[in-house]
Each structure stands twice: as structure tokens, then as C-alpha cells.
Swiss-Prot record:
Signal peptide: none annotated. DNA binds at R293, R312, R317. This is Holliday junction branch migration complex subunit RuvB. It catalyses: ATP + H2O = ADP + phosphate + H(+).
Length: 348
């Protein structure tokens, strides 16, 4: 199983091409992240008045919350050029040098997954961010020489889902750190309604709410669900997407009222029925579901923990009362000693 095989995956899908049309073009159109938006607007306005490059910006947050969209909006609001790449694509220092030397004054360079830059590339990036210079070594051995190249004053916008993997020297060079949070149901409802208008699809308030509450707090998922529900509505010749149409479509897509899909429910049900609600080790769950451990930890569990359905304890995974209620199952009585609060399980 991969993230790309799940409609509720926050990572970008190959078929998310329609997502571009739904993206806001200005900060005033961007819904959610109120404080982050307000601060960015102030920093952008100040940089424009001074006719200076904006300080380097770091967007931190889970996938699908709008980091790339905000980076594009920043460049648009500043009225400057925008270049985009990602950490894994910049394989060597020469690749980064080619990008930086082609930037115009005050341009924005966006690096997605910036935590995946190699150490060698990072070393070249430090003086570029701080002094707007490139320090390159030309040649090899005794003939090698150091060359300094002056760069246009640019703005680096980095995005990461794993802030803990950033090195301290890189993190400290960003003057404007911005953390993005999951969206509220009301915010997602507005995003879905706006998306429906952009797609020229009829949408009732309760239809937008039905999609929003299953979108896992993530605009990218909301947009993807909207496009799929639109397909069902058009196939059924529905005049508009109301709650009944949305509920039918999302039910057919196996996305339940809490935004859980078939894999989420299979995971929870296996712990509930086969292991008495836990605790059970992650290696045991990987074997029971025929999934690699990484898929369990990185793809399935994060949202279940966020929703309060699952606890990671020293002895393994443990379902909460909330999970049993959602599954419609009776929670077994458990001895506190079995709750996973004590002891250590080698495959936790």
C-alpha cells in the first residue's frame, strides 16, 4: 500500500492536476491560517515599501495544507519571479548554483522538502542565504581554487513536513518561520464551496459540510473529494451536490463520516477483534495486515492518533474508547497492568 493509492492521502497524487485550478491566487482569497496570513501580509507590504527582498521564509506543517500555494502567492504579491524545485532534485552543489545564478533581484526560489537537501548542497546554500554569495571550488587537487560569485538578493522559501530533520544552521537562516495547522471544519466548508464555484458545480451548504467534515482537516483532500463527488453528481444528473449526493458518493468511495477509509477501519478492527483492543506491537500489526512497518507508522497511524482513536504506548498500540464507539463495538474491560503504561515491548 502507498499513500498514492488512498483517496484520503494528504500527499499529492498524479491525478491532482485539477487541484491547480482550485488554488487561490492572492492572500485575500486564501482561506484559513488566519495569523500566518496576517503576518505574511505585513512582511510582504514592508518589503515592497522598502523595495527589498523579503526575508527567507520557512513553511512547516503536514502535507496538503497549502505550503506550495502560499509560496506562489508570496511571489505574486511581491510582483517578482518564482522558481520552484525540491530537495531531492538538487543532487549536487552545481545544480543549486545553476538555480541561484539565474535568479533576478528579489525573485523567490521555492524548495519543497527542503529537509532532504544533501549536506554538500546545504553548505553551498548557507553563504547564499546569508551573504548572497556562492563559494565554489573550481578544479581538483593542487590546481583547485575558490571562486566567489555575487548573487542577486533573493528570497528563499522552504517547505518541510519534517522540521525535526532540518539542521540547526539551515533552520536559523530563515528569518520568517511559519507553521501551518490543520483546518477547521468551517474553513474547509468555505474551501469546498469556493472550489465548487470555480468548477461551476452546484453546491448546497449541507453538501459542502458533508465533504468538509470527511477531509481530515486538509484542503488537498477536500479538493480531491470534491472532484470525485462531482463525478458522481454529474453521472446521476443531480442539479447540485447536497448532503444526500455527497453522502452516497463518499460512501461509495469508502470514506466514512470521520474521514476514515477502508484501510483505517481494517487497522482499527484488527486490533479490536483480534487483539482485544491492544496493546499490540507494530511488528505484529504489520504481519497481520501484510503491510510493511513503515506503512503502518507513516501512512496509517498518524491520522488515527490525531483523531484520538489510537495510542502509542511502551507496550504497543492501544485503541481508545473513542475508537470502539466509532466502530460500533463494545470495549472490553482491561486491567490497568495491560493498558501498556508499564513495561517495554521490543516491537513497539
Amino acid at each position: 500500500m502507498t499513500e498514492a493509492s488512498r483517496i484520503v492521502a494528504p500527499e499529492r497524487h498524479a491525478d491532482d492536476v485539477g487541484d491547480t485550478a482550485l488554488r487561490p491566487q492572492k492572500l485575500s482569497e486564501f482561506i484559513g491560517q488566519r495569523q500566518a496570513r496576517a503576518n505574511l501580509q505585513i512582511f510582504i507590504d514592508a518589503a515592497r515599501k522598502r523595495e527589498e527582498a523579503l526575508d527567507h521564509v520557512l513553511f512547516v506543517g503536514p502535507p496538503g495544507l497549502g505550503k506550495t500555494t502560499l509560496a506562489q502567492i508570496v511571489a505574486r504579491e511581491l510582483g517578482v519571479g518564482f522558481r520552484a524545485t525540491s530537495g531531492p532534485v538538487i543532487a549536487k552543489a552545481g545544480d543549486l548554483a545553476a538555480l541561484l545564478t539565474n535568479l533576478e533581484e528579489r525573485d523567490v526560489l521555492f524548495i519543497d522538502e527542503i529537509h532532504r537537501l544533501s549536506p554538500a548542497v546545504e553548505e553551498v546554500l548557507y553563504p547564499a542565504m546569508e551573504d548572497f554569495q556562492l563559494d565554489l571550488i573550481i578544479g581538483e587537487g593542487p590546481a583547485a581554487r575558490s571562486v566567489k560569485i555575487e548573487l542577486a538578493k533573493f528570497t528563499l522559501v522552504g517547505a518541510t513536513t519534517r522540521a525535526g530533520l532540518l539542521t540547526n544552521p539551515l533552520r536559523d537562516r530563515f528569518g520568517i518561520p511559519v507553521r501551518l495547522n490543520f483546518y477547521t471544519e468551517d474553513e474547509l466548508e468555505k474551501i469546498v464551496s469556493r472550489g465548487a464555484r470555480v468548477l461551476n458545480v452546484g453546491m448546497t451548504p449541507d453538501g459542502a459540510n458533508e465533504i468538509a467534515r470527511r477531509a481530515r482537516g486538509t484542503p488537498r483532500i477536500a479538493g480531491r473529494l470534491l472532484r470525485r463527488v462531482r463525478d458522481f453528481a454529474e453521472a446521476a444528473d443531480a442539479a447540485a451536490i447536497d448532503r444526500a449526493v455527497a453522502d452516497h458518493a463518499l460512501g461509495a468511495l469508502e470514506v466514512d463520516a470521520a474521514g476514515l477509509d477502508a484501510m483505517d477501519r481494517r487497522y482499527l478492527t484488527t486490533i479490536a477483534l483480534s487483539y482485544g483492543g491492544g496493546p499490540v506491537g507494530v511488528e505484529t500489526m504489520a504481519a497481520a495486515l501484510s503491510e510493511p512497518r513503515d506503512a503502518i507508522e507513516d501512512i496509517i497511524e498518524p491520522y488515527l492518533i490525531q483523531c484520538g482513536y489510537l495510542q502509542r504506548t511502551p507496550r504497543g498500540r492501544l485503541l481508545t474508547s473513542h475508537a470502539f464507539r466509532h466502530l460500533g463495538l463494545t470495549e472490553p474491560s482491561r486491567d490497568p497492568a495491560q493498558s501498556g503504561l508499564f513495561g517495554q515491548d521490543e516491537d513497539r
